[in-house]
Amino acid sequence: MSLNFLDFEQPIAELEAKIDSLTAVSRQDEKLDINLDEEVQRLREKSVELTRKIFSDLGAWQIAQLARHPRRPYTLDYIANIFTDFEELAGDRAYADDKAIVGGIARLDGRPVMIIGHQKGRETKEKIRRNFGMPAPEGYRKALRLMEMAERFKLPIITFIDTPGAYPGVGAEERGQSEAIARNLREMSRLNVPIVCTVIGEGGSGGALAIGVGDKVNMLQYSTYSVISPEGCASILWKSADKAPLAAEAMGITAHRLKELKMIDSVIPEPLGGAHRDYLAIAASLKAQLLADLSDLDVLNDEELLNRRYQRLMNYGYC
């Protein structure tokens, strides 16, 4: 799988290109007198050290780029690697089935759960079909339908957040985009089942919050959560999207900063180089966090669960 190196990773990309070149030469001519294996191993170790050095000092804008990485695992990737017996459920029973939201029933270590998440696309056709992960009102109404179903059957709800924001098109506004988001916020605050939310990529504004009201809210190490994109903020404050790196630092969009502000509960470590480097490793880490969170919430009765969730919402903004 191509790693699609970002701009700040170019020194790593150059080393990896050398490794690939030497490996190809070694395979083509096994009768070479020089030992390329040792050189390849040396370069691999150097690449790991360089990656560790670069990733030990990432800025908010670099993390924002990682959150949008084209090879980053999406909701369906986590479903495939964490859950079993997934049965997708479609439609909002009112207008349409929005492919930017996926959801359904699955098992987490044998336990039935309801999964809901944003889904972006990788290839052009899929990106268009998924609307680049930007849900319309019918997507959020589908999500609410599945949440209400989960409450009826006493299933914990697990959500995966990864969207640049709710779709801002005219049709979406005409069909009640703001109402759909607001209704989800209200209804999620009073569902009588545990809710665990995880930001796996971009957490963009109300489009993220509409499936982000939970008893536990986690973020992957290189994900972001904000009321507006850095480019949008820069365009408003400095009249130029070129100031996005400055805006990203000022906005406090990273997982560790939001943990400091008590906006989230846990930061889930990613493999060296980001989640796209090792799907199985990040899936294992996320699964462990989900199991731990559900174990913590299982001991609470309905009243305790709702009171705790209410207090959590009321404490936002107080540090």
UniProtKB/Swiss-Prot annotation:
HAMAP family: AcetylCoA_CT_alpha (MF_00823). One of its GO terms (molecular function) is ATP binding. GO terms for cellular component: acetyl-CoA carboxylase complex. Keywords: ATP-binding, Cytoplasm, Fatty acid biosynthesis, Fatty acid metabolism, Lipid biosynthesis, Lipid metabolism, Nucleotide-binding, Transferase. PROSITE patterns: COA_CT_CTER. Component of the acetyl coenzyme A carboxylase (ACC) complex. First, biotin carboxylase catalyzes the carboxylation of biotin on its carrier protein (BCCP) and then the CO(2) group is transferred by the carboxyltransferase to acetyl-CoA to form malonyl-CoA. GO terms for biological process: fatty acid biosynthetic process; malonyl-CoA biosynthetic process. Residues 35-296 form the CoA carboxyltransferase C-terminal domain. It catalyses: N(6)-carboxybiotinyl-L-lysyl-[protein] + acetyl-CoA = N(6)-biotinyl-L-lysyl-[protein] + malonyl-CoA. The gene is accA. Acetyl-CoA carboxylase is a heterohexamer composed of biotin carboxyl carrier protein (AccB), biotin carboxylase (AccC) and two subunits each of ACCase subunit alpha (AccA) and ACCase subunit beta (AccD). InterPro entries: Acetyl_CoA_COase_a_su, ClpP/crotonase-like_dom_sf, COA_CT_C. Pathway: Lipid metabolism; malonyl-CoA biosynthesis; malonyl-CoA from acetyl-CoA: step 1/1. This is Acetyl-coenzyme A carboxylase carboxyl transferase subunit alpha. Its EC number is 2.1.3.15. It is found in: Cytoplasm. Its main location: cytoplasm. Belongs to the AccA family. PANTHER family: ACETYL-COENZYME A CARBOXYLASE CARBOXYL TRANSFERASE SUBUNIT ALPHA, ACETYL-COENZYME A CARBOXYLASE CARBOXYL TRANSFERASE SUBUNIT ALPHA, CHLOROPLASTIC. It comes from the Bacteria.
